[in-house]
Curated annotation (Swiss-Prot):
Native source organism of the sequence: Bradyrhizobium diazoefficiens (strain JCM 10833 / BCRC 13528 / IAM 13628 / NBRC 14792 / USDA 110)
Cellular compartment(s): Cytoplasm
Enzyme Commission number(s): 2.6.1.16
CDD domains: GFAT, SIS_GlmS_GlmD_1, SIS_GlmS_GlmD_2
Encoding gene per record: glmS
Function: Catalyzes the first step in hexosamine metabolism, converting fructose-6P into glucosamine-6P using glutamine as a nitrogen source.
Active site (catalytic residues): C2, K603
GO cellular component: cytosol
Designated name of the protein: Glutamine--fructose-6-phosphate aminotransferase [isomerizing]
Lineage of the organism: Bacteria, Pseudomonadati, Pseudomonadota, Alphaproteobacteria, Hyphomicrobiales
Catalytic activity: D-fructose 6-phosphate + L-glutamine = D-glucosamine 6-phosphate + L-glutamate
Gene Ontology terms describing biological process: carbohydrate metabolic process; fructose 6-phosphate metabolic process; protein N-linked glycosylation; UDP-N-acetylglucosamine metabolic process
């Protein structure tokens, strides 16, 4: 969602603010702006669209202040215009905001009755005028912000600077993340560690309800009750190289090609190569023998990783698994048995719905495990157990390497569960671990299909609709493939269990419809072939992703057959994810879309 940065510096900060905002581009945005203290007065520069437009504004009208805040906006209230872009400001105060103010209507009506004139369509302007009104009434900045925060309902991260005070910045968090960066005679505020990477290696994360008063030499943190508190200082290593595309055209391409390496790193964290056994990086605070049911909760691509894991837990450990979309789970008051297990999957570790679901599960007394890519994130900090993925920062909005690393973690956890429950023998475990050890090499092999897929993408780019089909663990991958294609190419796509074809989707099949069939040769392959025959009979254009045996046994002519390496049937989603991602990527490139920052999407969804 929106990105926030603030700097109390010793040199002019406008250029630093923009550089930091570039590191937050992955979150998604449609406008951007900065505000600095010029002498005793606040000055803003804002622009619609990409940061290069803001840079042009700053070239034409430079800012020289050493105190400033910056923002990338992802529109929620109000259209993506310059007028609605942050920072918002009066003569006395400037503010940046990530989140949603839920009681903005009643606060706006109250302020308008008192004579306040609003100039934007945003809920953020309510915060601005609340603080400005309190300043007008004689309150000092710290007291004004404290009183204003008490009036707000919703999810928000806020940053404030004030006219006439070059050594003051205030931040507040209620939901979306906000970090403090500690420098030498300088202090920083940012949405995450990546934003602050060029400036400092020492940060603290505010907790929900916290607010902080920053000067160049101090950070005074208060909790929601107004008590001064200490928050742990964390060392991080978010260097500038982390957001470099190297020789790739897009971050997404780079991240697809990084998968053999990062999945290998994740594998090495979870498997003892010497003994060929699963070796989790943490001791679980529960015994799988006592678990009767697992609930897996996530959003988007992460939920499809959870869906794949459902098959693994049920097969390896004979444990029933329920997979929930977090935005539904958090409100349906699902009955959870105390002592059972809930797994929460999130790349950022800040997904608002997943975090709310986690808090519900904790209140119900179940064990909680977080599978996250950011071990210092809120979901990680609030979970009983953290199982990190080692994907490294993922900048492209459409998840690729985080997804496959999540699968690697979940596969190991499912094997550990099966072993603990006596459902897997030592021999079974060794066989499965052998299959996992082969995954990085097989992913490298899968990348060799890229030229074939690039040609295929020209055909897909002509289509209005695309259907993805799969059975077993290939069904969630079909859902993921459809999501990837529509996310970045804007072509409508749907994923279905192949057996559901005749229960509705078959009505869509005609000569213009590409149908991507994900079908490694396994015990349900023949069933999938029968579905392919149904597609062929109606003129559909079949794109088959299978192995050599499947290509040989398929009795239906395909437009294209993408032959994948032979591998352990249980873990095909990790390897078949590669051509699925490449197909979406190259189709989007042909369509000319913004691959890394597709329209209307945000990387880290920190509000509902």
């Amino acid at each position: 969602m929106c990105g926030i940065v603030g700097i109390l510096g010793r040199e002019p900060v406008a250029e630093q603010l923009v550089d930091s905002l570039k590191r937050l581009e992955y979150r998604g945005y449609d406008s951007a702006g900065v505000a600095t203290l010029e002498g005793r007065h606040l000055e803003r520069r804002r622009a619609e669209g990409k940061l290069k437009n803001l840079e042009k504004r700053l070239e034409a009208e430079p800012l020289k202040g050493t105190t400033g805040i910056g923002h990338t906006r992802w529109a929620t209230h109000g259209k993506p215009t310059v007028n609605n872009a942050h920072p918002h400001a009066t003569e006395r105060v400037a503010v940046v905001h990530n989140g949603i103010i839920e009681n903005f209507r009643e606060l706006r009506e109250e302020l308008e009755k008192n004579g306040t004139v609003f100039h934007t369509e945003t809920d953020t302007e309510i915060v601005l005028h609340l603080v400005d009104d309190l300043l007008t009434r004689g309150n000092k900045p710290v007291e004004a912000v404290k009183l204003a925060l008490a009036r707000l309902r919703g999810a928000f991260a806020l940053g404030f600077i004030f006219a006439g005070d070059n050594d003051l910045m205030i931040g507040a968090r209620n939901g979306p993340p906000l970090a403090i960066g500690y420098g030498d005679g300088e202090m920083y505020l940012g949405s995450d560690a990546i934003a602050l990477g060029p400036f400092t290696d020492t940060i603290s994360y505010l907790e929900d309800g916290d607010w902080v008063v920053l000067t160049r030499n101090s950070a005074t943190i208060f909790d929601k009750d107004g008590h001064a508190v200490q928050r742990e200082k964390i060392k991080h290593a978010a260097s500038t190289s982390l957001v470099d595309k190297a020789n790739y055209r897009h971050f997404m391409a780079k991240e697809i090609h990084e998968q053999p390496e990062v999945v290998g790193h994740t594998l090495a964290r979870y498997v003892d190569m010497a003994t060929e056994r699963v070796s989790l990086p943490v001791k679980l605070p529960f015994d799988f023998k006592n678990i009767q049911r697992i609930n897996i909760t996530a959003c988007g691509t992460a939920s499809y990783a959870g869906f794949v894991a459902k098959y693994w837990f049920e097969r390896f450990a004979r444990l029933p698994v329920e997979v929930d979309v977090a935005s539904e789970f958090r409100y349906r008051e699902a009955p959870l048995r105390k002592g059972d297990l809930a797994i929460f999957i999130s790349q950022s570790g800040e997904t608002a719905d997943t975090l709310a679901a986690l808090r519900y599960a904790k209140a119900e007394g179940v064990h909680t495990v977080a599978v996250v890519n950011v071990p210092t994130s809120t979901i990680a900090r609030e979970s009983e157990t953290v199982l990190p993925t080692l994907a490294g920062p993922e900048i492209g909005v459409a998840s690729t390497k985080a997804f496959t690393c999540q699968l690697m973690v979940l596969a190991n956890l499912a094997i550990a569960a099966g072993k603990a429950r006596g459902e897997l023998s030592d021999e079974d475990e060794t066989k499965l671990v052998h299959g996992l050890v082969e995954i990085p090499r097989l992913m490298s092999d899968a990348l060799t299909t890229e030229l074939q897929i690039e040609k295929l993408a020209r055909e897909i780019a002509k289509s209005r609709d695309v259907l993805y089909l799969g059975r077993g663990t290939s069904f969630p991958l079909a859902l993921e493939g459809a999501l990837k294609l529509k996310e970045i190419s804007y072509i409508h796509a749907e994923g279905y269990a192949a057996g559901e074809l005749k229960h509705g989707p078959i009505a869509l099949i005609d000569e213009t419809m590409p149908v991507v069939v994900i079908a490694p040769y396994d015990r349900v392959f023949e069933k999938t072939v029968s579905n392919m025959q149904e597609v062929a009979a109606r003129g559909g254009k079949i794109i088959l992703m299978t192995d050599a045996k499947g290509a040989e046994e398929a009795t239906v002519e395909s437009l294209v057959t993408i032959v994948m390496p032979d591998m352990a049937a249980a873990f095909t989603p990790m390897v078949y994810a590669v051509p699925v991602q490449l197909l979406a990527y190259h189709t989007a490139v042909i369509m000319g879309t913004d691959v890394d920052q597709p329209r209307n999407l945000a990387k880290s969804v920190t509000v509902e």
